[in-house]
Amino acid sequence: MGIGKSKINSCPLSLSWGKRHSVDTSPGYHESDSKKSEDLSLCNVAEHSNTTEGPTGKQEGAQSVEEMFEEEAEEEVFLKFVILHAEDDTDEALRVQNLLQDDFGIKPGIIFAEMPCGRQHLQNLDDAVNGSAWTILLLTENFLRDTWCNFQFYTSLMNSVNRQHKYNSVIPMRPLNNPLPRERTPFALQTINALEEESRGFPTQVERIFQESVYKTQQTIWKETRNMVQRQFIA
């Protein structure tokens, strides 16, 4: 499955997730949700400028932009995790999401198919990875068949290498259903200890990986980065 053929609603992460935690496949879902979501993506700041600056001058426009940022900041959420998965594994990804949130209290989290529509795949992936503390790669038989999934995991790994605070943030996971055998796992992922849901030590693995202190550190850096961009834009 190439990028242009993906049926997953893979569009950029809006980071305003307080009102929804499940996939809705109704016809009007993406249209209504995209109107509610307000994205402060670094690539999207210029668009806000065009819609907020009125004809009365730069000063009034700057004030409007500042007010807009303050309102949106109240709704922004830095996610605990995002699950990247193959198109055919949406149900399994939802099950894992609920497992982590309900059984282990690791929330909020999201799966790739839940993201609101409106952006291209690359922007969507960038927002998802950088808008969450951990990136979970759902290793199933379908994962290797999906070209887009292969691109996702390579991009996620490079991001974790190039950004110090993202070190060890990529978590391969073999779920209970249709897991990818170790011997067929890409070499780049074999070097990382994967979460094994069928293992007796799975609960211990989860507690060791998803530490609140790590989340808080990444959340602070995320907020500082966004605030810096907002100040530069307003100035």
Curated annotation (Swiss-Prot):
Domain of life the protein comes from: Eukaryota
GO BP annotations listed: cellular response to lipopolysaccharide; inflammatory response; innate immune response; negative regulation of chemokine (C-C motif) ligand 5 production; negative regulation of toll-like receptor 4 signaling pathway; phagocytosis; positive regulation of canonical NF-kappaB signal transduction; positive regulation of chemokine (C-C motif) ligand 5 production
Keyword rRNA-binding belongs to the record: no
Cellular component, GO annotation: cell projection; early endosome; early endosome membrane; endoplasmic reticulum; endosome; endosome membrane; Golgi apparatus; late endosome
Region (Disordered): 1-39
A Pfam family it matches: TIR_2
Modification type Phosphoserine: residues: 16
InterPro entries with a match to the protein in the record: TCAM1/2 (IPR046946), TIR_dom (IPR000157), Toll_tir_struct_dom_sf (IPR035897)
Gene Ontology molecular function terms on file: molecular adaptor activity; signaling adaptor activity
Domain named TIR: residues: 73-229
Expression sites by tissue: Expressed in spleen, prostate, testis, uterus, small intestine, colon, peripheral blood leukocytes, heart, placenta, lung, liver, skeletal muscle, and pancreas Isoform 2 is ubiquitously expressed (at lower levels than isoform 1).
Keyword Membrane: yes
Keyword terms: Cell membrane, Cell projection, Cytoplasm, Endoplasmic reticulum, Endosome, Golgi apparatus, Immunity, Inflammatory response, Innate immunity, Lipoprotein, Membrane, Myristate, Phosphoprotein
Biased composition (Basic and acidic residues): 30-39
Outcome reported for the amino acid change (mutating residue 116 to H): Loss of ability to dimerize. Significant loss of RANTES-inducing activity. Loss of ability to induce NF-kappa-B activation
Mutation effect (residue 16 to A): Loss of phosphorylation. Abolishes ability to activate IRF3 or NF-kappa-B and to transduce TLR4 signal
Modified residues (Phosphotyrosine): 167
Modification comment: Phosphorylated by PRKCE in response to LPS. Phosphorylation is essential for its function. It is depleted from the membrane upon phosphorylation. Tyrosine phosphorylation is inhibited by phosphatase PTPN4.
Positions where lipid (N-myristoyl glycine) attaches: 2
Subunit structure: Homodimer. Interacts with TLR4, TICAM1, IRF3 and IRF7 in response to LPS. Interacts with IL1R1, IL1RAP, IRAK2, IRAK3 and TRAF6. Interacts with protein kinase-inactive mutants of IRAK1 and IRAK4. Isoform 1 interacts with isoform 2; the interaction occurs in late endosomes and disrupts the interaction between isoform 1 and TICAM1. Interacts with MYD88; the interaction decreases after IL-18 stimulation in a time-dependent manner. Interacts with IL18R1 and IL18RAP. Interacts with TLR2. Interacts with RAB11FIP2.
UniProt remark on domains: The TIR domain mediates the interaction with TRAF6 and MYD88.
Function per UniProt: Functions as a sorting adapter in different signaling pathways to facilitate downstream signaling leading to type I interferon induction. In TLR4 signaling, physically bridges TLR4 and TICAM1 and functionally transmits signal to TICAM1 in early endosomes after endocytosis of TLR4. In TLR2 signaling, physically bridges TLR2 and MYD88 and is required for the TLR2-dependent movement of MYD88 to endosomes following ligand engagement. Involved in IL-18 signaling and is proposed to function as a sorting adapter for MYD88 in IL-18 signaling during adaptive immune response.
Name under which the protein is recorded: TIR domain-containing adapter molecule 2
